[in-house]
């Protein structure tokens, strides 16, 4: 899971381990193409209770899906992780908001390896062909979310992709991508 980087300064050398989860482990633990109500029910616990109380307010489950993949795929979310978290029936913490998932990923993996800024609803998916990793779409114009987080397998997203929008006034302003082996 780790990659070593060797840094040298003033005659001193040190190796820094950069740890990233394996894509195959995240994908194996990601609820691929599972509808949001089913995601909440499967995860249970506090997450499902909140969904049952307010299905409209908790209609988006993308951060919950990615939280599961991270929790079981080698980059667990800790109780001390900043952000709005809830517990699933497995007693693990899950992030529910895209904004907080972006912070979590950046804090653990650094800035995105690739940042794309589509113009005029341009489909930039070809620039990620044959790459695998975590993908985040920052979206303008949605009333209930600031974006979408998911996994990209080189051809498609684990649930939904938002490279192009067919809804008036909705655009993807930025695509952030972290490459995983």
Briefly describe each language-model feature range:
Residues 2-89:
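N-terminal capping segments
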Residues 22, 26, 50, 64-66, ...:
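Generic detector of leucine side chains in alpha-helical contexts
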Residues 19, 29, 54, 60, ...:
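Detector for Asparagine
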Residues 1-18, 135-181:
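Active-site or metal-binding loop neighborhoods of secreted/extracellular toxin and effector enzymes
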Residues 86-162:
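...with weaker cross-activation on analogous glycine-rich loops/strands in unrelated enzymes
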């Amino acid at each position: 899971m780790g990659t070593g980087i060797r840094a040298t300064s003033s005659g001193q050398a040190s190796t820094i381990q950069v740890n990233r989860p394996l894509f195959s482990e995240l994908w194996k633990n990601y609820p691929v193409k599972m509808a949001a109500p089913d995601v909440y029910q499967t995860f249970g616990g506090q997450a499902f209770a909140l969904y049952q109380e307010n299905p409209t307010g908790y209609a988006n489950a993308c951060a919950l899906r990615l939280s599961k993949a991270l929790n079981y795929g080698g980059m667990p979310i800790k109780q001390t992780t900043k952000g709005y978290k809830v517990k699933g029936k497995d007693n693990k913490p899950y992030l529910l908001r895209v904004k907080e998932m972006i912070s979590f990923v950046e804090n653990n993996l650094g800035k995105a390896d690739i940042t794309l800024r589509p113009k005029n609803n341009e489909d930039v998916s070809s620039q990620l062909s044959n790459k695998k990793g975590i993908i985040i779409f920052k979206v303008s114009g949605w009333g209930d979310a600031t974006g979408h987080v998911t996994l990209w397998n080189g051809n498609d997203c684990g649930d939904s992709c938002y490279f192009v929008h067919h809804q008036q006034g909705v655009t993807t302003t930025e695509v952030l991508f972290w490459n995983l082996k």
